[in-house]
């Protein structure tokens, strides 16, 4: 299958807003973008993003579109879809309201018609916002285009959902008092029954109120009529203090950065995933430069150890990977994390990863397509004999133990619960569901395993990292990427304790 990875075509759309939900006289200024995120010989994926640049909250939205070349949608996620060309999309409950400055996004996958990934006109009520029509920073194999819909028309205000678990009754049960969680810039449902960490209720992932409230400003619990956090009390924060070791300085720094410049050129690589619970290579003083502190290890109960010479749990010692090395979202398009790389002087180096929209070894992977245009910055904490050049083995709880396994003993789980040795939960889900299932099915399966292994045992931080993989990382299976070495953000060095900036030795060449 010949993949055209990373091809993105933006289109400014007319955005249909449900008139009954709008207050009289309010002026909406939403920017709506249709993007072809990936295309291969017979199919495509695309996303539609609605950004509220207006002066009031958008309460309810609807968009419609029609393919004229025979293209057809085969699956969707994060929206209720109806019709068989034309198509209409409406919210799934938790993304009904769009606070000022926030956005919602949903995606579709389909089969191509007689042309390459047609960009249809999307109709609805007028979107009044102005947005950039510049191409995405993803390397493009085709020219980008931008079209403003000049003749929008009203779309149906009542669209039934064709996505399991997205009916109005089930959606409303995940929402708590017309509130949602602004999880580092992404609106996420609040849980009704889960008291701490992340949960999975009524067919979707949700965040407990205490966990949501523990985020730094401006994030937290928001009203559907306001983007201002409603709860950040010290009592709420203290109840989940154990689930986050991020310092206040780190939190404030993380909230001030939402994007990084795109990579110009760069090196070719790909990302895999693992979490083996072992003490990492960079945890020994002999493996880091003399002016750099080694990575601290933790005990079996996740308490930091001051003795850097403690042996690895994978060799019978008491040193484990600390749970604060989970990946985390900074914005909807930027995340930070930690990774194993190939051998050499890598400890403490940071790399910008820009995902191209295709998989390294799984052609047509819907998760890799949905990940297109997103960026990660990872710090190297480990090396692996099974990690090749250009490969970044990202630390993801539930990502597979790989060559070593100290997790079964540390977490009290069976080997079978850990999923596939290489690939973890997602690989096990693909074995269970087959390799032609929809992205929403893969995500749901992974989230169920996150809840079963971590949520049921109160392993909140690990559950957050696992959920991040399904949500922000789009359950992408070994996505291809462009990368380059960059200065390390304070958010990463504060957590790891490794800061090699004094060495001023960033490499600008590909291996």
UniProtKB/Swiss-Prot annotation:
InterPro entries with a match to the protein in the record: CBD2, CBM10, CBM10/Dockerin_dom, CBM10_sf, CBM2/CBM3_carb-bd_dom_sf, CBM2_carb-bd_dom_sf, CBM2_CS, GH45_Enzymes
Subcellular location: Periplasm
Main location: periplasm
Keyword Hydrolase among record annotations: yes
Catalytic site: 276 (nucleophile), 393 (proton donor)
Ranges for region Disordered: 137-173
Enzyme nomenclature, EC number: 3.2.1.4
Cell inner membrane as UniProt keyword: no
GO BP term, pick one: cellulose catabolic process
Domain CBM10: 180-209
Catalytic activity line of the entry: Endohydrolysis of (1->4)-beta-D-glucosidic linkages in cellulose, lichenin and cereal beta-D-glucans
Domain of life: Bacteria
Alphabetized GO MF terms: cellulase activity; cellulose binding
Disulfide bonds: 32-127, 181-212, 191-206
Alphabetized Pfam families for the sequence: CBM_10, CBM_2, Glyco_hydro_45
Domain CBM2: 30-130
Signal peptide bounds: 1-29
Key words of the record: Carbohydrate metabolism, Cellulose degradation, Disulfide bond, Glycosidase, Hydrolase, Periplasm, Polysaccharide degradation, Signal
GO cellular component: periplasmic space
Family the UniProt entry places it in: Belongs to the glycosyl hydrolase 45 (cellulase K) family.
Function: This enzyme catalyzes the endohydrolysis of 1,4-beta-glucosidic linkages in cellulose, lichenin and cereal beta-D-glucans. EGB is most active against barley beta-glucan, but showed significant activity against amorphous and crystalline cellulose.
Protein known as: Endoglucanase B
